[in-house]
Amino acid sequence: MQKFLISFSLFVTTLVAQEYVAKDYNYLINKMPEIHPELLQVHFKLYGGYVDQVNRLNLLLEGEKKGSIETSFTYQAIKRRYGWEYDGMVLHELYFDNLGGSEKLDQGSLLYQKIVQQFGSYDNWIRDFKATALTRGVGWVVLSWDSKKDLLFNAWITEHDTGPLYKYTPLLVVDLWEHAYLSQFQLD
């Protein structure tokens, strides 16, 4: 079992051991007057840090593979940390990709129809989404789709690397960590 896990781990690490480049989201600064440019710039910098950390961890993993990874605490610690940094990078990309739109969800779209079918109305879904977002603590609220059961679900995810619903596809992501709002909106 241990040999299988090690060989599988090496295979997966090789798949992800490419350099990631932070996406440029500066176009959002002028598209979103309700969020101060300074807040967005700080948030973009934080996101860039996640991208840098993922690349750094990939390099460290490559270096560790030259040693005895089966008993390496360093290798195992890097693997644990990887989920935090990688998921932080991906969740920020999903969040920023959601921002800047000025159009309402098309009532004829499949997503809109699914929301109404499952929640009873679009307003009911918004109410549920906002109630989920008001969960005390830091984290993310994610509208997710379970393709297996064809269900939508508003989920609260506290940490980047704990709590994701792995069979769900994220459709809408909102960052509710303090860095996303506190300097502009305080605790309101």
Region locations from a protein language model:
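Sec-dependent N-terminal signal peptides
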Residues: 4-13
